[in-house]
Amino acid sequence: KDWRHKTLSKGKFMGGASSMTAENWQRLCVEQITGKKCEKTNLRLNLDNATMMELTRPSTRDDELDWSEDFDGRIVNKKEYLYNFKMVIGTGGGQTRTIRELYHFIKCQFVFLKDNPDTEIVFINILDGDSMSAKLHRFIELKTKFSEHARIFIGDTKTYQKNWKKY
């Protein structure tokens, strides 16, 4: 928490206008690691049926609550890489809700791959912060439930830097 406060926000509260600071830092790290531009995207997963579509405003739809947050980034090379960035620090109800929503989002990624075995999509979930680190084992356990685990990365920025070429 202190590192994020000092390094990413220059000592300022990270809310409002600076709430994207952590995501922007993670995006920059991915671009430095891969040497590729990580473009923003409006792609979302439907949490009920594991379909995917470009959707900028799910709140205008009757099924608005069935849609995930959008993926934070996309890199297309030989495969299509969809990135999800999270930095969760501290403890409390907000952090617990974020982690729970994230769990269902990542679980849906596995179902999407299972339902679309010929897709060239690889999901990259970069999860930083002390709260994420403490719960990362729950997400690793999730990988053991699906044979599609080789097409989903779950880990922090440092682990991604070490292993990104495997994906």
Regions found by a protein language model. Name each.
Residues 119-167:
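Domain-level recognition of nuclease-like catalytic cores that cleave nucleotide substrates
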Residues 67-82:
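Active-site beta-strand-loop-beta-strand hairpin of nuclease catalytic cores
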Residues 46-65:
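Charged, often glycine-rich, active-site loop that binds/positions anionic groups
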Residues 10-18, 65, 90-94:
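Conserved aromatic-histidine-acidic binding/catalytic patches
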Residues 87-134:
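Catalytic cores of nucleic-acid endonucleases
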Residues 7, 83-89:
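Short glycine/proline-rich turn/loop motifs
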Residues 1-44:
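Interdomain/boundary linker segments immediately adjacent to catalytic/signaling cores
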Residues 25-37, 105-113, 143-146, 164:
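Hydrophobic, Leu/Ile/Phe/Ala-enriched alpha-helical segments that form helix-helix packing faces
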